[in-house]
């Protein structure tokens, strides 16, 4: 035909062979006549997919979402010295609050990620913050954390406070592109427990008050370790 300068449309995709980069394979005009391939079936075309053989959402360019969760949270430190969760020798309710994060995926670089309490930014993870596969990071409200904490990464809130409200709060973690990665609603757990809430069993379970779990042997919290005090890995 005249439109195709005398060239046929061999693959019948509506694009004449002289303009079709894949003349024997039906394709899309936006892709110069070549097929729009999505090898992993995640809805992100291979040409735009940073992980073409691993399904993942568009917001992460086709790569899997970060696999991180909150395993334990202390928003109501116990009274007096038993509430010294960060181990610095003093009980200060804002400083002894903590959030324990567990990474159940591969090594995860969270440099530049941020933690918000409701709308307030409370912490930005500094450059070089990488949680290893199966690793833990404990974020305290402040103070001078003293102890091994199961070999976990330990940081204090860059804004000097977490300020988790005993009557309920909403914690959100954003990645370096300001995409929400993790949300946690404290409100269902808001009963002024004077101890932490932790998953039981660790990682996979629902949240329960720490001291009531048999393996805790009465301990009120376990930042950086499993509920029985053992290391995660």
Predicted feature descriptions by range:
Residues 59, 212-213:
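Acidic, Ser/Thr/Gly/Pro-rich low-complexity segments and short DxT(G/T)-type signature motifs
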Residues 65-209, 226-233:
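Activation on beta-sandwich/Ig-like modules and their edge loops
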Residues 1-67:
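Extracellular calcium-associated, cysteine-rich motifs in secreted modular proteins
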